[in-house]
Amino acid sequence: MKDLKELRDQIDVIDRQIVDLYQERMEIAAGVAEYKINTGKKVFDKEREDSKLATLTALGKTDFNKHGIRELFEQIMSMSRKRQYQLLTAHGMYENRILQKWKV
């Protein structure tokens, strides 16, 4: 049996990898926002997110892991949308869409 320190060290390594991957994902989300700025596409694509969540959840080996994977990616996708909205707002796009919706 491994000792507790060794197990925690392994978790620490994985946690740093997760942080690096999260930051890389947010950089890519900024690129997605740039694409959407240039094409006028909406940030939220329910069909895409639902499909992605189903695919990722299916990768879980147990029901517990499937549930956790779904929660994890729902949060990651939410943060990705927030980042995209942030960039759209910085470019004046989000306010323009709201104004157009309400015809102000």
What residue ranges belong to the model's regions?
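Domain-level signature for soluble enzymes in the chorismate/prephenate branch of the shikimate pathway
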Residues: M1-V104
